[in-house]
Swiss-Prot record:
InterPro entries: Exonuc_VII_L (IPR003753), Exonuc_VII_lsu_C (IPR020579), OB-fold_nuc-bd_dom (IPR025824). Keywords: Cytoplasm, Exonuclease, Hydrolase, Nuclease. This is Exodeoxyribonuclease 7 large subunit. Heterooligomer composed of large and small subunits. Belongs to the XseA family. It catalyses: Exonucleolytic cleavage in either 5'- to 3'- or 3'- to 5'-direction to yield nucleoside 5'-phosphates. It is an enzyme of class 3 (hydrolase). Residues 452-477 are annotated as: Disordered. One of its GO terms (biological process) is DNA catabolic process. Pfam families: Exonuc_VII_L, tRNA_anti_2. GO terms for molecular function: exodeoxyribonuclease VII activity; nucleic acid binding. It is found in: Cytoplasm.
Amino acid sequence: MSDLIAQSRAGDNAEPLSVSALSQMLKRTVEDRFGYVRLRGELSGVKRAASGHMYCSLKDEKAVIDGVMWKGTTARLAFQPEDGLEVIATGKLTTYPGRSKYQIVLESLEMAGEGALLALLEKTRQRLEAEGLFARDRKRPLPFLPRTIGVVTSPTGAVIRDILHRLADRFPSHVLVWPVLVQGQGAAEQVSAAIRGFGAIKAGGEVPRPDLLIVARGGGSIEDLWSFNEEMVVRAIADSPIPVISAVGHETDTTLADYAADRRAPTPTAAAEIAVPVKGELAATLNDYAARQQRGVLRPLSLGRERLEARVQRLPTIETLLQPQAQKLDERVERLRGALRDRAAKGREALATQRLSPTMLQRAEREARRKLDQVRLAPALVERRAARDGERLAGLSRVLATLNPRAPLERGYALVRDADGKLVRAKGEATKQARLAVEFADGSLDVVPAGKAAAAPKRVKKSPPPGTSGAQEDLFG
């Protein structure tokens, strides 16, 4: 190219170059001279064309260079390029003949430094959180005892071995492993595809559908774990119809996948411990529950049986209940029969003293026979009559007890009488008497009012209770 320039300066008859030819010569010179380069700069003017290609500029404080990334490369990016991000770009320097400018064809982009990654991470987290992907009400409970567990991780390394070993120790389960890359280019696509692939398995098919998913990888730097901060992975976890445990990195590592998962485990081993219980402990717990349930059922029955037996022992027998009533019935029947005999005897005496016609005797005899038949053929009538008489007698006894003047004496009161046996009701009457008799429940006591000389005691005759007499009342009078 330098020879062509020298010839043109000599003014000879060299044939002039076309614009396109010169542009091609410049293009080859730039590409041959520089080849692949790595640039560090800030993204600016990021645009995606309808074709899928991405156009942008890389700049620093003093210069700007245009860049282009073709559709296939753009789809494999590990993050979403945005204006203001500081990146390290790898590509091939070339020219664009159509506009007489040079540019870099980008073949890879990576975040420049941890600070830029953290800034992008926080910005993405806020945006996805605003969409509700991390809401607590989206979290689903994990199955208590999953029969099949799907694991999304690298098929090699310590992570899968730790998970399988821990599951076997605690509660052996059927495990399906979907092998994926866990860092670098294409890792995010494989992880999200594996999560969606497990969710697409039909229940009841040849391949068992997992009841629980574990998305896991070991620890590393923020760049190593970046695939699990990618939006496609976060959305795959949030959309998964199967509950997901995220176990990415160590306990101090946090990714956006942890926010979207139904449960976060600090380590892959801890994820296995969360997924299944210890079989031996579960069996012991079940045995304890069974024993407690059996005791809870049998103890009330035993206590009820003991209380029932105690109450049965305290219950009186039928004979004990009926004996007093039968005795009372016998007594009343005998009294009734005696009264009937007395009445019949009195009737016979009256008939003997009177002159009766045969018709009257016959009628009286028929009436007596009828009553006798009633007594003989209807013992229930006798029992009812005896019951009524007993109730009447009990009522009269209560009235008699109420009217008995000695009843107050039994309660601690006393009767004061003068020498003639009359009741003294006032203090003034008592002071006029030379001697008084005080009657108690168990006897009488003679007293002298204060200031009076003692007089000869006079025996006070007790008066019978009102309403009573020396003769017994006739029950049938």
